């Protein structure tokens, strides 16, 4: 919505109390966390995925497609040891997600929807403004007070600047009275939306609600390849974009911690109902991890 002053993104160091970061997330729907991934981890991760990134051909479509001059790569857990053994073991990420999705005594209330590297090439146009929860179209209709369905952690692998396509965020758009699609026909604020660029250094990230309006900015540079690492997480009741257990080899799955195995669908989550305990993604009422022969997480 139009305002007298440009919107401002709240920022916290990764050492700040999780409750403070979560409060800012609840208020604005997005918050920048500085130093979320240690720079040395991010540098090693970037080196490990570089050969795969170099094999991806850049598409130039000039048709408004979100892949126009953008590289995307999702096979991170099978490509990068740093990703699966270090970056995914981020305790702050889980502290925040527990506050968003989980109930006491019920384990993880969430799992990964997708994990992806997104690299915006020089000359790439600005992305269409959107809400990520449009993946589940009915969620917008439930309005701003509905539970979160999706939370993104979007990490800078290379510097994010206003010039090279830093994501444009609209803080507070998670609380707009109507969560409509962002287009001329359905959004009363269309053409009058003020956004702020997420300026970040490698290792910084923004945590974002699926309700928040955002879009990659235009990369107006001649040589900057703006590289990001995105974790998309969803409620355990929802189906993810990536069929992780069908393409992650068991050899890799066995290397993961029990918590990360659950995030990728190799373990069940539980919910306590009035008369019983239900295993989501289970096997005959038991943890799917037992069927797969994974060691006990107890």
From Swiss-Prot:
Pfam family name, one: PhyH
The protein's required cofactors: Fe cation
Enzyme class: oxidoreductase
Domain of life: Eukaryota
Site (Important for reaction specificity): 150, 232
Enzyme Commission (EC) number: 1.14.11.-
Residues that hold Fe cation according to the record: 130, 132, 214
Entry function: Multifunctional dioxygenase; part of the gene cluster that mediates the biosynthesis of calidodehydroaustin, a fungal meroterpenoid. The first step of the pathway is the synthesis of 3,5-dimethylorsellinic acid by the polyketide synthase ausA. 3,5-dimethylorsellinic acid is then prenylated by the polyprenyl transferase ausN. Further epoxidation by the FAD-dependent monooxygenase ausM and cyclization by the probable terpene cyclase ausL lead to the formation of protoaustinoid A.
Family: Belongs to the PhyH family.
Miscellaneous: In A.calidoustus, the austinoid gene cluster lies on a contiguous DNA region, while clusters from E.nidulans and P.brasilianum are split in their respective genomes. Genetic rearrangements provoked variability among the clusters and E.nidulans produces the least number of austionoid derivatives with the end products austinol and dehydroaustinol, while P.brasilianum can produce until acetoxydehydroaustin, and A.calidoustus produces the highest number of identified derivatives.
Name this protein carries in UniProt: Multifunctional dioxygenase ausE
């Amino acid at each position: 919505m139009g305002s007298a002053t440009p919107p401002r993104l709240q920022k916290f160091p990764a050492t700040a109390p999780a409750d403070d970061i979560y409060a800012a997330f609840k208020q604005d729907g997005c918050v920048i966390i500085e130093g979320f991934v240690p720079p040395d981890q991010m540098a090693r991760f970037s080196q490990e995925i570089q050969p795969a990134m170099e094999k991806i051909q850049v598409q130039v479509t000039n048709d408004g497609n979100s892949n126009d001059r953008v590289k995307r790569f999702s096979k991170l857990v099978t490509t990068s040891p740093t990703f699966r053994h270090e970056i995914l073991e981020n305790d702050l990420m889980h502290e925040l997600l527990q506050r968003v999705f989980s109930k006491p005594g019920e384990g993880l209330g969430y799992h990964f929807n997708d994990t992806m590297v997104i690299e915006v090439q020089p000359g790439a146009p600005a992305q269409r403004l959107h809400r990520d929860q449009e993946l589940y179209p009915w969620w917008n209709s439930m309005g701003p007070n509905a539970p979160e369905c999706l939370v993104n952690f979007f990490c800078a692998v290379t510097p994010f600047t206003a010039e090279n396509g830093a994501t444009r965020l609209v803080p507070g758009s998670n609380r707009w009275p109507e969560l409509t699609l962002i287009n001329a026909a359905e959004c009363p604020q269309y053409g009058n939306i003020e956004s702020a660029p997420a300026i970040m250094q490698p290792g910084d990230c923004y945590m974002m609600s699926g309700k928040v309006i955002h879009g990659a900015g235009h990369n107006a540079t001649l040589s900057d390849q703006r590289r990001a690492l995105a974790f998309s997480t969803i409620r355990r009741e929802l189906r993810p974009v990536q069929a992780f257990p069908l393409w992650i080899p068991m050899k890799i799955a066995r290397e993961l911690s029990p918590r990360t195995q659950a995030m990728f669908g190799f373990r069940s989550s539980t919910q306590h109902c009035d008369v019983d305990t239900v295993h989501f993604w289970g096997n005959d009422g038991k943890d799917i991890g037992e069927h797969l022969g994974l060691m006990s997480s107890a």
